[in-house]
A protein has these predicted regions:
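Nucleotidyltransferase catalytic core that binds NTPs
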Residues: 1-156
């Protein structure tokens, strides 16, 4: 049986912490679809094509990973792809409480989709996409937050 999970996020950009969660999800599922969300109300630091390119660089050599973009409810994307598991990563208890609330709401909308919350490994707990963006704006150096081998594109 081929088990699939959706790993949704804005991934602006995809970090070493995201990769840690993805690799751990791949030990539980045959396929993990990284779903890059489009938020019409937010202007991303990196555009959609750049974010997808960063993820492609990060997952190079990993089997069972595909990348999509979506602009509807995450639950609707799960149904569109026949997925019954959604993976979410958390760094700390604040993240956990937020994700648990979202999972509860999603369960009401779609009881057939289960949210799997994976705590990031401790060495990645300090990493966030927001921190990467701050470092890029202020210092220009953020490689220590990124998956090995990822080269960030020029930003707008």
């Amino acid at each position: 049986m081929n088990t699939k999970a959706l790993f949704p996020g804005s991934f602006d950009p995809f970090t070493a912490g995201h990769l840690n969660i993805l690799k751990r999800a791949l030990t539980m599922f045959d396929e993990v679809i990284v779903a890059v969300g489009i938020n019409q109300d937010k202007r991303g630091f990196f555009d959609m094509d750049q974010r997808i390119d960063i993820i492609r660089q990060a997952v190079k050599g990993l089997n069972g990973v595909s990348i999509i973009k979506y602009d509807n409810l995450t639950i609707d994307t799960c149904h569109e792809y026949g997925i019954h598991h959604m993976v979410r990563g958390v760094r700390n208890m604040i993240d956990f409480e937020t994700e648990r609330s979202i999972a509860d709401a999603n369960r009401k909308l779609a009881p057939d989709v289960e949210t799997i919350i994976i705590p990031t490994a401790q060495e990645f707990a300090h990493i966030s996409s927001s921190a990467v963006r701050v470092f890029l704006k202020l210092h220009g150096e953020s490689s220590f937050f990124l998956p090995e081998g990822v080269i960030l594109p020029e930003t707008r």
